[in-house]
């Protein structure tokens, strides 16, 4: 049975691998500097997000992108506001703190950073002037940690709040492609590009072997990135490998019949399988945890079901509820098929 543990268990989508093989014997400068593939990928991304004034840089993975993106826009006496389940707060081993910056979590429980909760953190942190870490940025993820997709209204509300407090806006886009192709999405990437100080387009979790593309509008991060990515151990000597992959992902030659890049096509397939899984599990009587129209789906199960699913399909446990039941996660990837979903549903039916 296929695993539903995460969206990076497989290697890479065939079109991505084909591009790597086709260019394998080419020789290019290192470190993403001046090679033809990185430069073309940068321009393709600028064109796609609708901004020619941004820098496009590459990081090896999400943690590296977050470290450089967050610390490059903050002084060491400043902090970043995020939700309590934000990735930089709970899943990156204190990397922001290790770089001398402070994470300031809110009590938002649904994965979305709200103006009301962010205001509480702001009021507390600024209540004694120079004696506390000063908030200087907000950090959000699209999709959220529990699969939520930001609406344009909600995104604009938190951006308006941040701008009214002169805070920078960083969007973790490890699963940006899933968010953008969700059937419930009304927030285009071009609008994110207009409002965010920086964001990134995740490749690792969307059919690439590795790599994230940071889109940087903030002048401080533009200046800092080349140095921070090296200092923090994230600069690849064979940087052209990142350029080749993102070039293939946004190359017009790989656009589908609907006129969207390969980057979106891969995510759209994963989302479709995830929605099929969600609906099938609900039909079998499994309780969804929250609401997700992206490639991550969460369900409330008994401890016995938790163990059975973990062994059969690799589901991971995210929370233990007060009544002892577990919240487990299923993730679909570019490689997931409808047949894979149906096989897992047949198993789920047997233990319902």
What is the predicted role of each segment?
Residues 3-6, 56-60, 82-83, 140, ...:
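General beta-strand structural signal in soluble alpha/beta enzymes
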Residues 4, 45, 65, 96, ...:
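Buried hydrophobic positions in well-ordered alpha/beta secondary-structure cores of metabolic enzymes
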Residues 72-90, 119:
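Conserved PLP-anchoring active-site segment centered on the Schiff-base-forming lysine
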Residues 75-77, 275-350:
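Conserved C-terminal alpha-helix-loop-beta "cap" of PLP-dependent enzymes
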Residues 100-145, 149-157:
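PLP-dependent aminotransferase-class I/II
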Residues 150-182:
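Catalytic PLP-binding core of fold-type I/II PLP enzymes
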């Amino acid at each position: 049975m296929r695993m539903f543990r995460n969206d990076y268990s497989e290697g890479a989508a065939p079109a991505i691998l084909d591009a790597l093989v086709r260019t394998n014997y080419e020789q290019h400068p290192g470190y993403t500097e001046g090679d033809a593939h990185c430069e073309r990928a940068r321009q393709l991304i600028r064109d796609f997000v609708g901004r020619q004034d941004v820098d496009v840089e590459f990081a090896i993975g999400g943690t590296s992108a977050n470290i450089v993106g967050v610390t490059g826009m903050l002084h060491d006496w400043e902090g970043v506001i995020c939700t309590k389940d934000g990735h930089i707060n709970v899943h990156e081993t204190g990397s922001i703190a290790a770089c001398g910056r402070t994470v300031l979590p809110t009590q938002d429980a649904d994965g979305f950073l709200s103006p009301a909760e962010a205001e509480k953190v702001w009021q507390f942190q600024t209540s004694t002037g120079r004696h506390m870490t000063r908030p200087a940025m907000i950090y959000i993820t699209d999709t959220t940690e529990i699969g939520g997709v930001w609406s344009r209204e909600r995104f604009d509300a938190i951006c308006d709040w941040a701008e009214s407090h002169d805070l920078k806006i960083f969007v973790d886009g490890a699963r940006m492609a899933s968010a953008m192709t969700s059937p419930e999405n009304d927030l285009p990437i071009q609008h994110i590009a207009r409002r965010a100080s920086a964001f990134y387009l995740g490749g690792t979790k969307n059919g690439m072997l590795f790599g994230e593309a940071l889109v940087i509008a903030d002048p401080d991060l533009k200046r800092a990135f080349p140095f921070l990515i090296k200092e923090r151990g994230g600069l690849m000597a064979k940087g052209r490998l990142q350029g080749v992959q993102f070039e293939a992902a946004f190359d017009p030659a790989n656009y589908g019949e609907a006129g969207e890049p390969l980057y979106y096509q891969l995510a759209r397939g994963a989302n479709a399988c995830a929605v099929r899984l969600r609906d099938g599990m609900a039909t079998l009587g499994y309780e969804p945890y929250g609401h997700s129209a992206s490639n991550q789906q969460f369900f409330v199960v008994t401890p016995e079901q938790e163990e059975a699913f973990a062994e059969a399909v690799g589901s991971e446990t995210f929370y233990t509820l007060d009544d002892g039941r577990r919240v487990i996660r299923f993730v679909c990837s570019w490689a997931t098929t409808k047949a894979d979903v149906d096989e897992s549903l047949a198993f789920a039916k047997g233990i319902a």
